[in-house]
């Protein structure tokens, strides 16, 4: 079995899922094309990182689908001078994307294990 090509999967996610949902902001598409979504997921779900699915994180929490994350980032219209507060950061992927679009991001997560995993993913 061949290992999954995450780079190709990321490219296809943006071109076949996110962009068709009218996410056309080039900065948002660039961020979603480069930030490794799989790094923010439990190992058991990494092979589904680029599927059009909300994936379980534990504690009854789920990721947003990539198309929803793209729409949210586009709607925020973040500027490089903006400061962002993310409450309920979950796996940290959205905060990571925002961090590449804005000046500073403060992400809060009530579940310690999710916060630690998000911190680790953001440190990579």
Locate the predicted segments by residue.
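A generic secondary-structure micro-motif detector
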Residues: 3-4, 62, 108
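A short alpha-helix capping/helix-coil boundary motif
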Residues: 7-9, 52, 73, 96-100
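Conserved alpha-helix/loop element of class I SAM-dependent methyltransferases that forms part
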Residues: 14-15, 19-20, 49-52, 59, ...
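Alpha-helix N-capping/helix-start residues
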Residues: 25-26, 66, 112
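Conserved nucleotide-cofactor-binding alpha/beta core module
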Residues: 77-124
